[in-house]
């Protein structure tokens, strides 16, 4: 798999935009990443077990991507870690403490930016901050390349700009764990790759732990230290991505990891036997990159 011209152009553009942003956030001012441990977690809905004895760890500052087919339990796991729902069995800890006691260290970024339409961009970023930290919100907005949009209304922003504001709103609280629930799924190809570069740059600079849920295997390879595959509520694969950063989408090593993960996903495709390779690849493309869907839970 070689990088196409659209990807190449997007990567070049992303690099240019990143060089233009300010850098008010730094590792020196951040608390650092948190150690995540999901221990034997079970989650049921209406008697049906969605997650079965999940064991997952993330070291402080590690970037872990979770992939899998629709309905496998990816977003459910993220909601449990975020504290939006409770596990039926098992435990989730951050730095060996119950996750519920460290909720102030967790922030979630969704596919829907969830900006308040009646507040301007800077006011959205500053939500929940004391008045004396308003300048900090402006600095973080500059960090994501939107200094000149501080007084704009959300309705005037593009999809990519709205997600940049959502990212700034998360980072202004200095999270030690950033949870990303398909935050780029509704963006066009150029904007998606640009946002990947921005997220990676800020993660490397600030050192927070990141957990990304995505249907896009290429995105997982581009961003993650490890790729975890969930199948039928179980962890079926845990692949380390041993590639130098920033990742080169068109490299042979990148393509090999991407293909290996896709093949592993396709092994579990319903009725895969007897289906041609081209049909399987088409099914994988459809199932691993989804369009916008409604958000079913509140922050």
From Swiss-Prot:
Annotated keywords: ATP-binding, Cell inner membrane, Cell membrane, Membrane, Nucleotide-binding, Translocase, Transport
Function: Part of the ABC transporter complex SsuABC involved in aliphatic sulfonates import. Responsible for energy coupling to the transport system.
Class of enzymatic activity (EC top level): translocase
Binding residues for ATP: 68-75
Gene Ontology molecular function: ATP binding; ATP hydrolysis activity
Coiled coil (UniProt feature): none
EC number: 7.6.2.14
Upper classification of the organism: Bacteria, Pseudomonadati, Pseudomonadota, Betaproteobacteria, Burkholderiales
SUPFAM superfamilies, per database record: P-loop containing nucleoside triphosphate hydrolases
GO CC annotation, single: plasma membrane
Protein name: Aliphatic sulfonates import ATP-binding protein SsuB
Main location, first listed in the record: membrane
Gene3D superfamilies referenced in this protein's UniProt entry, alphabetically: P-loop containing nucleotide triphosphate hydrolases
Quaternary data: The complex is composed of two ATP-binding proteins (SsuB), two transmembrane proteins (SsuC) and a solute-binding protein (SsuA).
Catalysed reactions, as listed in the record: ATP + H2O + aliphatic sulfonate-[sulfonate-binding protein]Side 1 = ADP + phosphate + aliphatic sulfonateSide 2 + [sulfonate-binding protein]Side 1
Domain ABC transporter span(s) in chain numbering: 36-257
Family per similarity comment: Belongs to the ABC transporter superfamily. Aliphatic sulfonates importer (TC 3.A.1.17.2) family.
Membrane topology, as annotated: Peripheral membrane protein
Subcellular compartments: Cell inner membrane
């Amino acid at each position: 798999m070689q990088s196409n011209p659209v990807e190449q152009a997007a990567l070049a553009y992303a690099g240019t935009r990143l060089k233009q942003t300010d850098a008010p956030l730094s590792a020196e001012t951040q608390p650092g990443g948190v150690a995540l441990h999901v221990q034997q977690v079970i989650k049921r809905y209406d008697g049906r077990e969605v997650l079965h004895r999940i064991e997952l760890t993330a070291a402080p500052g590690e970037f872990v991507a979770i992939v899998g087919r629709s309905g496998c339990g990816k977003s459910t796991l993220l909601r449990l870690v975020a504290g939006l729902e409770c596990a039926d069995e098992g435990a989730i800890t951050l730095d060996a403490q119950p996750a519920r006691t460290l909720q102030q260290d967790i922030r979630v970024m969704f596919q829907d930016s969830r900006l308040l339409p009646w507040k301007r961009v800077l006011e959205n970023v500053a939500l929940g901050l004391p008045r004396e930290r308003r300048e900090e919100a402006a600095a973080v907005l500059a960090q994501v390349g939107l200094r000149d949009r501080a007084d704009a209304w959300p309705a005037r922003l593009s999809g990519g700009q709205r997600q940049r504001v959502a990212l700034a709103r998360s980072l202004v609280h200095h999270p030690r764990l950033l949870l990303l629930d398909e935050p780029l799924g509704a963006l066009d190809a150029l904007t998606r790759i640009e946002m990947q570069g921005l997220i990676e740059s800020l993660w490397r600079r600030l050192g927070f732990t990141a957990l990304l849920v995505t249907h896009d295997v290429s995105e997982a390879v581009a961003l993650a230290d490890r790729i975890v595959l969930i199948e039928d509520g179980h962890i079926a694969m845990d692949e380390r991505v041993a590639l130098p950063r920033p990742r080169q989408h068109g490299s042979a090593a990148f393509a090999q990891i991407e293909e290996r993960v896709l093949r592993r996903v396709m092994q579990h495709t319903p009725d895969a036997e007897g289906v041609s390779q081209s049909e399987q690849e088409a099914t994988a493309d459809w199932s691993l990159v989804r369009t916008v869907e409604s958000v079913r839970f509140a922050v």
